[in-house]
Every structure is written in C-alpha cells, then in structure tokens.
C-alpha cells in the first residue's frame, strides 16, 4: 500500500471526473477513520471528527491543518469548538472526490 501522505496534492481545474464508488472504496482503505458522506447534491465528501482535551488543543490542530492546506493548495471545510474538530474534504471544482482529497486526509492524519 502506498503512503498517500508522501504524495503532493494536484490542483484540479475541473477537467477530471470525480471518483466513482469503487475508486472511493479503494482509496478509503488507505486512510484511517475517515467516512464518506453525500452533500445535498449527492456528491461525495470525506469527513472525520477529531477529539481533543480542550479548546486550545482543537485550535492548535486547526492551525496545523491550515498550514498543510496552504502548502498543498487544497483547502478543507473546518469547524471546531471545545474538544473537537470536524474536517470535511472534497474537490470543489468537480463536486466530488479525487486522489488529492485522500492525500490531504492522509497528511492531516500525520499531525
């Protein structure tokens, strides 16, 4: 199994199709603890909730995720509060999932 966290996210200009369910399940096996859900338009996204001891730990984690997102030019939706951080990842340009989404998830898991 390749280590997705060592790959680089590739910018998407919308010229590729989103992953189908078989591709999603293949890549989902390469990341730990992430779930696949549907947006209102039925497109897929990755989601994971991280737990922390307090607000400060959550905020520090968000800052680290933000740094990775900037390095990779791939930006997740983030919500956080006392003791938690929820990360939602998908490729906006294709309204679905692509390899870069799984790469970003793997990099976040390395924090």
Describe the role of every protein-language-model region.
Residues 1-56, 63-111:
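Long, contiguous binding/interaction regions
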């Amino acid at each position: 199994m390749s280590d997705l966290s060592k790959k680089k996210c590739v910018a998407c200009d919308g010229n590729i199709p989103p992953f189908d369910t078989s591709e999603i399940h293949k890549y989902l096996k390469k990341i730990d603890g992430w779930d696949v859900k549907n947006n209102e338009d039925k497109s897929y996204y990755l989601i994971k909730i991280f737990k922390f001891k307090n607000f400060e730990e959550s905020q520090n984690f968000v800052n680290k995720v933000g740094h990775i997102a900037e390095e990779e030019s791939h930006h997740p939706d983030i919500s956080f509060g006392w003791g938690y951080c929820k990360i939602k990842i998908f490729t906006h340009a294709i309204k679905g999932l692509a390899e870069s989404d799984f790469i970003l998830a793997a990099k976040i898991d390395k924090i």
